[in-house]
Each structure stands twice: as structure tokens, then as C-alpha cells.
């Protein structure tokens, strides 16, 4: 990467990126392998990221953000994702899936209560959409929120919720009118310490070992009506809009994963000697490196296009967000695989980071919408069946 050729970035963007890169190299890189092996969630590092103001790029200063915008958010997310897939999730849990949703749809009271606390990491956030039997088909969710005086009574179960075992609050989607299907969905802010909320960690997963993920069981949980986001019954529309934001973050994190794989592979190719010279001299190794670099840069270009559009006010750019998400997340699966070809046997050992990068890269094709769903949105838009940008 050459700084002067990054023509899309302002000097401010470059300074921010350099600052975050230095932070990640100094604070995250030395502990990442140990934290992953020990499945240790680093709350202290989340606090440090908050102290540096990293969560606040798309949030106005008035609510504790810095208003630097979406491209700044993508740059920060990539740099943290490059160092740790587990810590990358913070940019959806503190910002896009929580603070930004509350900023868009919350009452003034709710905004003041939650957004600054998320920005400073005084509160840890999560968002609950997926259920055991309602995943890609979000409108099939069965968690209910039934109005009872000044409160909603919530019953149901959420599955695969990032940070739920450590979270203080949750942006929760539930059915206020089950019969109305997607028109009966609403969004709430739920206090995770409320009576009736139980979060159970899913401990044995393929990757992201330092990132607690869990189920949320809700039994007669009472949420004040003031914690309803926007209007009752409009939750499905809000969910789609929230996903347009969270998918940008996932795509930016995926680029970080790709870049980490590129870095490790280049280093190794130059250091590893076989047949009397570095393997970097062999054309077949160069071919692999070329593909890794090109895939990473292509993914980054799509992420930046999407973020720049949002910075120009085109925040509902579903089409471009989904294209970036599809491409970058596919690359986060493929580029570390290519890295394993370069590192070969040593890459198969946990002595080198490529094994962790490969494991963590797998998740991007699943979360914030599986790859098939991205392809479906791209194709139905292209075929004129359903316009993605509305
Ligand atoms: C580590 C991790 C963290 C997560 N964090 C969160 C979180 O914080 N909050 C949250 O709400 N959710 C979270 N999720 C859930 C995630 O968003 C879902 O896993 C995702 O939406 C897809 O659901 P599924 O994996 O159950 O797949 P399913 O929906 O069961 O689909 C299975 C397969 O069928 C395909 N498929 C489904 N429908 C179609 C169709 N119509 N056409 C073609 N193919 C189709 C899918 O592409 C997929 O390949 C997380 C998941 C993981 C693994």
C-alpha cells in the first residue's frame, strides 16, 4: 500500500489510519494469540479503543462521537480487523448495530442514555436478530413483545448473538404482532440486566475465540415503552437499514483479515529458503501473492466506494453495500487459504498467525447475512426483479 496513491483519503483519514495501526501493533498484536488460545475477552482493549474515540466516526459529537464519517469508520475497522477478528466486532456492537440505530430511531432520552455510554464503552452493546429457527428469514422470528400498560413483556430466544454474554444492553428485534409477519416487527433497547434475561455463551466455535458469542433467553422480560425504537410495526424496515450499516463494518473487517494474510505471506515468502533461495523467487509463489494482493485491493476499493457514498448522504446504498460485503467476505475466506499455500506446513501450526486468520476469516460469509442472501440481492436488483436502493 502506498500512501500517496490513496487518493480517496484526506490527510485526516491517513492520520487516523496511522494512529489506529500503531495502536493495533502496540496493544493488540502482542496479546492476540494468547487471548485467542485462552478464549479471553479483552474488555480493557475495548475501553482503550473507546478512549481513542474509535467507535464514534459515524456518530455526531453531540452524542459522544466525532462525526468523521463512514470512510473513517471503515479505515478504523480494517486496522483493528487486521490485528484481531475478535476485536473487530466492537465496531458493530458499539457503533453500527447499536449506537447508530438508537441515533436514527430512539427518543432524545434514549439517545442521551445509551449513545455516549456506548461511545465511551461504559456500556457494552449487542444486537439480537437471529433465532434458532429464524436466521436468513428474519421475518420468521418468534420472539414476542406484548404491550402491557407502560411496558412490553418479551418472551423468546435469540441465537448467535455476539457479545451477549458480556453485554449491558441489546438492540432487540421482536414481534409486537405475530400475525402481521414482517409488518408486526418492532425494535427495542433491552437492558441485559433485566430480570428474565439469561445469556449463555456458545463456547465451542470454529474461530473468534476471544469474542464471546451466545444465546439470549428472555422470559417475561419487561421493557419500558420508552425503549421502543421509532414506531411499533416498523421494525423490519429498521432492521434492513441497520443491516446496510453493519454490513459495511463486516466488509471492512474482512479487508483487514485479507491484509493480515497478505502481510504474513509476504514476510514468510521472503524469509523461507528452499532450493537455495527465498521461495518469493518462485513464479508459482508469486502468482499466489499476486492473487492475494489483487483480491484484497479490489475488496478495499468496493468498501471505500460504499463508505464514500454514505459520507455523501447516500446512506441507503444497499446495492453497493451488499456488493462490497459479498466480495470482501468471499475474499476473507479465500485470501487466507492462499496464505496457507505460501506458509504450507508452518501455516498449519498455531506457531504462525495464518491459522487464526484463516479460522476467523470464515465467519464473514455468514454474519450480517449469508453470502447467498447477498447474491440474491445483487441478482434481483440486476435483473430488475427488486430494486436494492430504495
Ligand atoms: C460468530 C457469529 C456471530 C453472529 N453474531 C450475530 C449477532 O450479533 N446478532 C445476530 O442477530 N445474529 C448474529 N449471527 C447470526 C448470523 O447473522 C446468521 O448466522 C446469518 O444471518 C445466517 O443464518 P444461518 O447461518 O443460520 O443460516 P440459514 O439462514 O439457516 O441458512 C443456511 C444456508 O442456506 C442458505 N439460504 C438460506 N436461505 C436461502 C435462500 N432464500 N436462498 C438461497 N440460499 C439460502 C444460506 O445462505 C446458508 O448458506 C452470528 C453468527 C455467527 C456465526
Report each predicted region and the residues it spans.
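Short glycine/proline-enriched turns and hinge-like loops at secondary-structure junctions
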Residues: 68, 137-139, 163-168, 181-184, ...
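Conserved hydrophobic/aromatic beta-strand scaffold that supports enzyme active sites
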Residues: 126, 140-144, 151, 169-173, ...
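Alpha-helical interface subdomain recognition
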Residues: 1-93, 105-110, 117-122, 135-138, ...
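Flexible, small-/acidic-enriched active-site or ligand-binding loops
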Residues: 140, 193-224
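A short core secondary-structure module
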Residues: 150-151, 155-199
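A short, Trp-centered hydrophobic/proline-enriched beta-strand micro-motif
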Residues: 121-129
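Flexible, glycine-rich active-site loops centered on histidine and acidic residues
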Residues: 99-105, 127, 139, 179
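Short Gly/Pro-enriched turn/cap motifs at secondary-structure boundaries
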Residues: 91, 118, 133-136, 160-163, ...
Amino acid at each position: 500500500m502506498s500512501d500517496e496513491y490513496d487518493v480517496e483519503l484526506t490527510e485526516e483519514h491517513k492520520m487516523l489510519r496511522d494512529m489506529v495501526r500503531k495502536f493495533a501493533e502496540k496493544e493488540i498484536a502482542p496479546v492476540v494469540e494468547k487471548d485467542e488460545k485462552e478464549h479471553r475477552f479483552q474488555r480493557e482493549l475495548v475501553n482503550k479503543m473507546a478512549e481513542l474515540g474509535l467507535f464514534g466516526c459515524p456518530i455526531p459529537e453531540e452524542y459522544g462521537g466525532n462525526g468523521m464519517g463512514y470512510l473513517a469508520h471503515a479505515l478504523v475497522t480494517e486496522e483493528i480487523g487486521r490485528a484481531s477478528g475478535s476485536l473487530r466486532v466492537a465496531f458493530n456492537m458499539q457503533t453500527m448495530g447499536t449506537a447508530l440505530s438508537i441515533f436514527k430511531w430512539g427518543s432524545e432520552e434514549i439517545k442521551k442514555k445509551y449513545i455516549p455510554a456506548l461511545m465511551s464503552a461504559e456500556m457494552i452493546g449487542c444486537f439480537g436478530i437471529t433465532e434458532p429457527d429464524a436466521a436468513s428469514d428474519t421475518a420468521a422470528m418468534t420472539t414476542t413483545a406484548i404491550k402491557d400498560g407502560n411496558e412490553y413483556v418479551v418472551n423468546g430466544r435469540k441465537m448467535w448473538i455476539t457479545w451477549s454474554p458480556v453485554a449491558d444492553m441489546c438492540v432487540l428485534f421482536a414481534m409486537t404482532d405475530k400475525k402481521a409477519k414482517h409488518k408486526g416487527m418492532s425494535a427495542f433497547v433491552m437492558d441485559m440486566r433485566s430480570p428474565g434475561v439469561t445469556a449463555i455463551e456458545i463456547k465451542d466455535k470454529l474461530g473468534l475465540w476471544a469474542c464471546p458469542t451466545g444465546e439470549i433467553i428472555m422470559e417475561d422480560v419487561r421493557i419500558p415503552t420508552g425503549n421502543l425504537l421509532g414506531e411499533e410495526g416498523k421494525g423490519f424496515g429498521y432492521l434492513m437499514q441497520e443491516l446496510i450499516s453493519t454490513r459495511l463494518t463486516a466488509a471492512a473487517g474482512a479487508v483487514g483479515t485479507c491484509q493480515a494474510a497478505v502481510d504474513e505471506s509476504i514476510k514468510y515468502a521472503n524469509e523461507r529458503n528452499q532450493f537455495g533461495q527465498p521461495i518469493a523467487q518462485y513464479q508459482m509463489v508469486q502468482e499466489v501473492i499476486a492473487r492475494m494482493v489483487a483480491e484484497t485491493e479490489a475488496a478495499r476499493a468496493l468498501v471505500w466506494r460504499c463508505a464514500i457514498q454514505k459520507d455523501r448522504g447516500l446512506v441507503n446504498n444497499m446495492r453497493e453495500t451488499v456488493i462490497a460485503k459479498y466480495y470482501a467476505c468471499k475474499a476473507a475466506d479465500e485470501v487466507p487459504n492462499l496464505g496457507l499455500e505460501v506458509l504450507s506446513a508452518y501455516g498449519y501450526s498455531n506457531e504462525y498467525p495464518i491459522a487464526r486468520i484463516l479460522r476467523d476469516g470464515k465467519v464473514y460469509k455468514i454474519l450480517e447475512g449469508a453470502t447467498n442472501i447477498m447474491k440474491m440481492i445483487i441478482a434481483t436488483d440486476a435483473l430488475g426483479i427488486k430494486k436494492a436502493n430504495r
